[in-house]
């Protein structure tokens, strides 16, 4: 009988001790996001959360998303502390479109080799995003999968659940001719269009550390996605909101029609705002057409709100008081059968 080497999980590339060390590092992050409805702490097989008091007919709203290939750029630049904010933003901003208050959030972190410092930086960002949006980070999964990811590359996904009163669901059905449209400024490209961003960087051979306005190209591209939860929830309480559109993948052409009834058209006034410098740089460096820019990027507009025209000034005042850069970007008109639902002029 020959002696055989005793193999362990660590020999196979999975370090359970590193995973446990990460859990200890992030417990405080979760605690800072806690809501009174959450029962128990991290470490259970499932997270328990009550419906907040005061709802008569609560409807749960769920969403999941990732950060896309913005993550590749962040990994290459070793900038791990803000992609977690992006992750939360992409989920919670989708929830508030239907008028839902985010309740709790879970994350999934997958990597070929777990680097505790990197993972802790990412999760700390997730915690910051949860604090900004008022939702609780109740759990997650860290998967170390050797052979599935190159080196210390990683991917992240987020899952969020919110709640809305059934009678107060915002579904776009009330949008009608004469409604005003408000834009909420984006902080940058947010988390969409980064495969095109990376292609432009490759073809142009641009130095990402080059100055761009009062920052650098790298910082402008990696600026975390703006979270609109708190100001928008306040707006919903104070004003009659007919629809909200989160300008993500598909840009203006695809996201605005998602909340418009048939035979209505959004007319966007292109003169009402100036593209932030990063979008002008991308268009020029990549020789990207205007149509493709509006199809791929938010071009400085993170969310569009439809509401009765007589609510416009009240809403703008409230949003600006809440710290948002908001402006009147257009209006709703009738559209004939087969006519485009978005016009940018």
Curated annotation (Swiss-Prot):
Source species, domain of life: Bacteria
Main subcellular location: cytoplasm
Recorded catalytic activity of this chain's protein: 2-formamido-N(1)-(5-O-phospho-beta-D-ribosyl)acetamidine + ATP = 5-amino-1-(5-phospho-beta-D-ribosyl)imidazole + ADP + phosphate + H(+)
Presence of keyword Repeat: no
EC number: 6.3.3.1
CDD domains assigned: PurM
Gene Ontology CC terms, in alphabetical order: cytosol
Gene3D superfamilies recorded: PurM-like C-terminal domain, PurM-like, N-terminal domain
Compartmental location: Cytoplasm
GO terms, biological process: 'de novo' IMP biosynthetic process; adenine biosynthetic process
GO MF term (any one): phosphoribosylamine-glycine ligase activity
Keywords, sorted A to Z: ATP-binding, Cytoplasm, Ligase, Nucleotide-binding, Purine biosynthesis
Pathway: Purine metabolism; IMP biosynthesis via de novo pathway; 5-amino-1-(5-phospho-D-ribosyl)imidazole from N(2)-formyl-N(1)-(5-phospho-D-ribosyl)glycinamide: step 2/2
Family under the similarity heading: Belongs to the AIR synthase family.
NCBIfam families linked to this entry: purM
Designated name of the protein: Phosphoribosylformylglycinamidine cyclo-ligase
Organism placement in taxonomy: Bacteria, Pseudomonadati, Pseudomonadota, Gammaproteobacteria, Aeromonadales
